[in-house]
Amino acid sequence: MTTTVAVTGAAGGLGEAIARAFADDGATVALGGRDRDAIEALADELGGVALRTDVRDEFEVERLLEEASRAGEESGVDVVVPCAAVFHGDPGNAPLDETAYSAFDDTMRTNLRGVFAAVREAVPHMDETGRVLIPTGSVAREAKAGFGAYAVSKAAAEGAMRQFAADCEQAVGCVDPGTVDTALHGLGGRDPSEAADLFTWAASVPEELDGEILGLKDWKQATR
């Protein structure tokens, strides 16, 4: 049976790399993103499906997960990775006390509410073997000056993960790939394709994943 994986934020960066990694492992991928042309081109390349999705709109997220549930050999969704995220301002130079209300609201609506919507809409299409992999970062747990609303949103997303894990029969956890070289922050870091391998591994260890945060150290210890 082919695994069906839904990824938001798949138009580029880490989301695209995660979609590619799962497709390389034989999964059927359902791709959501705001850049319609980018996700449709990627879906054509990977043999998956794509739907223009703004995670701030729960109805668009609902449609993506419904499409994903019909994309594979069997109905349903096996894995969801809510990767869509935004960062308003310059990382390291975006203090919370200077953050505009509009920027704070958009960050939380995308990085927290978008995660909530993706998981909430995925669960009805999952059986008890389903897995939810929520990307996170160290700023969620270790305060760093200048990361403002982004850090707050990631901390809140980790809190949402723990509650979903307590409430749902599926394995729900966070994956921390460290700093990844994407356009989101422009800080350099690990190649997205390397970081994506951490997600495919995390999907294979649901007992270790559920309610936890899996990072590079866990992956390297398990795969060395």
Language-model features: where?
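The beta1-alpha1 cofactor-binding region of Rossmann-like NAD(H)/NADP(H)-dependent oxidoreductases
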Residues: 37, 51-66
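Amphipathic alpha-helical dimer-interface segment in Rossmann-like NAD(P)H-dependent oxidoreductases
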Residues: 66-73, 109-130
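Catalytic loop of short-chain dehydrogenase/reductase
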Residues: 128-156, 161-166
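Conserved glycine-rich Rossmann-like NAD(P)H-binding loop of the short-chain dehydrogenase/reductase
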Residues: 25-41
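C-terminal helical subdomain
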Residues: 170, 174-175, 186-224
